[in-house]
Swiss-Prot record:
Lineage per the UniProt record: Eukaryota, Metazoa, Ecdysozoa, Arthropoda, Hexapoda
Organism: Tribolium castaneum (Red flour beetle)
Topology of this chain in the membrane: Peripheral membrane protein
Protein's UniProt name: Chaoptin
Gene Ontology biological-process entries: cell adhesion; visual perception
Origin: domain of life: Eukaryota
Length: 782
């Protein structure tokens, strides 16, 4: 569109048009905002000129648009927003303004002022270096101000003036080197105020000199910040009383991924409403005994990934609201007696430390009775002798003792834990179990998940656990699994037998009628016949056969497995004319396929030639043996939606032919993380936009972990990101980066690396607490 005869362009609809969208519509030669053509649209409420090449927006561009509510100008090349562009007496209905992904360098005084209905301003991913005083002024309805991804180094006092309803101020990914709470003196006094200053250049947090209070302009008093995120900076020291202005308001404080050395009462001891404190990934050596003296509402404390070697006995005295404590990845050799005195503790993580014994005496009877999850993995615990103290854990449902030095589990050890549902004893290589099953006495009807990986088993112990859902026996020396085992684990749905001495698929799988997931990776199985999987064929949904040197694979081995949804296999060189599509021709429901290559292989053209199952939409290629992929390998893809993962291979280049030959594909996503040799990935999109006939568009891309060169071969990524924002990321659906970080933090804790991540009641309850502070409502069904 060149806007010839601009004044006549919208004459006929000037009094009726409410919404005008010209995204990616203007000629590249149009650099000036087309105000002459648009000014006659006097009833226009929403204007979208995003994804063009606009450079200049004159200050009178919107003066005739008195009904304007939303302005979308993101993804242009705008260099300046002139003072007076938006005026309070004209734009009384304006609610949202988007200038994201432009080239704005500064925000002048009164650029956004006296706009009584304005709720959102988005200036993220520009080149803003400075914010002038009173740049944002008298915006009484403003709730979100997004300034992330700029070059802001300092923020002047009174930059934000009279913004009483502000809830979310995002300053992440800037160059801010100092923090003065005085800049928030007139911000967020009436709402739940969140400040995100993560990923900046903060080093030393010092107390700023006080600023004289102006009665006629300021709101005065202490700050109303509820959530403060200072993570991913370089903070090495925090001055005493630094948090004094926000002590009475803070509910969540995030200081993870910094370089703090200690935690004291002067910093965290007087925050009466603080519920969440994240000090993870620092260099903490110690916590003072009175660190939380008057911070009595603390519910979640994370001090993981530090250098703490000792915990003071009185650290948690009188903290009756404490629910989750994470001491993992430290240097603790013991925990003091009665460290946890109050009732209410639900999860304790002391994994990856140096504990030599169970810290049972660290919990009083009151705290032990409410504990639901206990993680003691990766320590040096050698004995579970407890003198009956385990019986105090009446609510314990999740216990992880993996990667310790346990030698023996006596009969009835867990008998006093009536609700234990998940038990991990894996990787205690010297562990001796009672073959008659007495080691698990008392857990017969409560145990749902059991991990016995790498515990030197030569036979499966007797398990009288009819409700057991998952059993992991990987990295043992099992030559077989006795058929009689099935009778006592009749509800089993997941069975992991990786890296044992199995020479054939165990017949016991034929009797496990509820089995859905079976993993046999790394066993010396050489033959897979038409009857090997016959017993499980009618219900199995996932099968892992990686790292197996098959010499015989009968053509009907998988043909009866109609419910199969996920298959992981290798490239079996000892099988003549091995072809994957041919062995899967009857698996119409297969959606996910992983092909693992261990031995050096140039291509898989022959192995992958042919038509793939119609619903196959996720293909993973893994293994150092794979050196090259070609377009011929993907000619058989038939699903219109396709996700390609290339993980931990020796591939150097992924050519365009790979994607050009996926003829039926319309939406493609690519994950090429962790390929240390990969240097070149050509554009997977064969069309210029989504929905274009006979072409595919890239919907998602993950690149981390390669040896990428920022040259022309990778330059397409920037153009694609622009199009993705335009077509796939509607502005109205964008979520606050602060909320993402908070939810992401929870998900990182939840992702324990277990075979099955179990979101327990502890986390569901606490998730509500966290998200309620950031304005997100959580619902779930039991």
């Amino acid at each position: 569109c060149h806007f010839k005869h601009r004044k006549q362009r919208f004459v006929d609809i000037g009094d009726s048009l409410l919404t005008l969208k010209l995204t990616h519509a203007l000629s590249s030669s149009v650099q000036n905002f087309p105000s002459d053509a648009i000014k006659i649209l006097n009833r226009l409420e929403e204007l979208d000129l995003s994804n063009n090449r606009l450079r200049n927006v004159p200050d009178n561009s919107f003066h005739f648009l008195r009904s304007l509510k939303k302005v979308h100008l993101q993804d242009n090349t705008i260099e300046m927003i002139h003072r007076g562009t938006f005026q309070g007496d004209i734009h009384r209905d304006l609610t949202e303004v988007y200038f994201s992904f432009n080239s704005v360098r500064n925000v002048q005084q009164h650029t956004f002022a006296d706009l009584i209905q304005l709720e959102q301003i988005h200036l993220d991913d520009n080149r803003i270096e400075s914010l002038e005083r009173r740049a944002f002024m008298n915006l009484k309805s403003l709730k979100r101000l997004n300034l992330k991804g700029n070059k802001i180094a300092t923020i002047a006092y009174e930059t934000f003036q009279n913004l009483p309803e502000l809830e979310d101020l995002d300053l992440a990914y800037n160059s801010i080197s100092s923090l003065d709470f005085n800049i928030f003196d007139q911000v967020g006094s009436l709402g739940m105020f969140h400040v995100n200053m993560s990923h900046n250049k903060l080093i030393n947090l010092v107390v700023a000199p006080s600023v004289p209070f102006e009665q006629d302009t300021g709101l005065g008093g202490l700050q109303n910040i509820k959530v403060l995120d200072l993570s991913f900076n370089n903070i090495t020291s925090v001055a005493k009383q630094f948090f004094r202005p926000v002590e009475l308001s803070l509910m969540q404080l995030y200081l993870g991924h910094n370089k703090l050395l200690n935690a004291t009462k002067d910093l965290f001891g007087n925050m009466p409403h603080l519920q969440v404190l994240d000090l993870s990934h620092n260099s903490l050596y110690e916590l003072d005994f009175d660190t939380f003296r008057n911070t009595k509402k603390l519910q979640w404390l994370d001090t993981s990934h530090n250098r703490i070697s000792e915990i003071p006995n009185d650290l948690f005295r009188f903290l009756g609201n404490l629910r989750i404590v994470d001491f993992s990845h430290n240097r603790l050799r013991s925990l003091p007696d009665n460290l946890f005195r109050e009732t209410g503790l639900e999860r304790l993580d002391v994994s990856h430390n140096l504990l030599g014994k169970l810290p049972l005496t660290s919990l009083s009877l009151a705290s032990a009775q409410t504990l639901s999850e206990l993680d003691l993995s990766w320590n040096s615990i050698s004995s579970l002798s407890h003198g009956g103290q385990l019986a105090r854990f009446k609510c314990l449902s999740w216990l992880d003792l993996s990667y310790n030095r346990l030698g023996q589990i006596d009969a009835g050890t867990f008998k006093g834990i009536p609700r234990l549902a998940s038990l991990n004893l894996g990787h205690n290589s010297q562990l001796t179990l009672e073959i008659n099953g007495l080691s698990f006495q008392g857990l017969e009807y409560t145990l749902l998940h059991l991990n016995l990986d790498n515990v030197s088993l030569s036979q499966v112990p007797a398990l009288s656990t009819p409700n057991l859902l998952s059993l992991s026996l990987a990295f043992n020396s099992l030559p077989t699994v006795a058929l009689e085992v099935a009778g006592n684990i009749s509800s089993l749905r997941y069975l992991n037998l990786d890296y044992n001495d199995l020479s054939a698929v165990p017949i016991v799988t034929h009797s496990l009628t509820e089995l859905r997931h079976l993993s046999l990776e790394g066993n010396p199985i050489t033959t897979l016949s038409n009857t090997s999987l016959l017993g499980a064929a009618n219900q199995l949904e996932e099968l892992n056969l990686k790292n197996i040197d098959l010499t015989v694979l009968e053509s009907g081995a998988f043909c009866k497995m109609q419910p199969l949804r996920t298959l992981k296999i290798g490239v079996y060189r000892n099988i003549k004319n091995f072809n994957i599509p041919s062995i899967l021709q009857f698996n119409d429901g297969l959606k996910n396929l992983e092909i693992h290559v261990t031995k050096d292989t140039d291509t898989l053209d022959n192995e992958m030639r042919g038509a793939w199952p119609l619903k196959l939409q996720n293909l993973t290629l893994s293994g150092k043996g794979l050196k090259k992929i070609t377009g011929k390998m993907f000619q058989g893809v038939r699903s219109p939606t396709f996700h390609l993962t290339v993980r931990n291979t020796s591939i150097i280049k992924i050519p365009f032919d790979v994607f050009r030959n996926m003829l039926p594909v319309r939406n493609v996503s690519v994950d090429v993380r962790d390929n240390i040799l990969l240097k070149n990935l050509q554009n997977p999109s064969t069309g210029s936009k989504p929905g274009k006939p006979r072409s595919a568009f890239l919907t998602d891309l993950k690149l981390m972990g390669g040896k990428w060169s920022c040259d022309c071969d990778l330059g397409w990524v920037e153009v694609w990101e622009r199009k993705r924002r335009q077509y796939l990321c509607p502005v109205l659906l964008r979520v606050s980066i602060l909320r993402n970080i908070i939810v992401g933090t929870l998900m990182m804790v939840l992702g324990t690396g277990c075979v099955r991540i179990k979101i327990t009641g502890v986390w569901l309850k606490f998730l509500r607490v966290i998200l309620s502070v950031v304005g997100v409502k959580l619902r779930w069904r039991n």
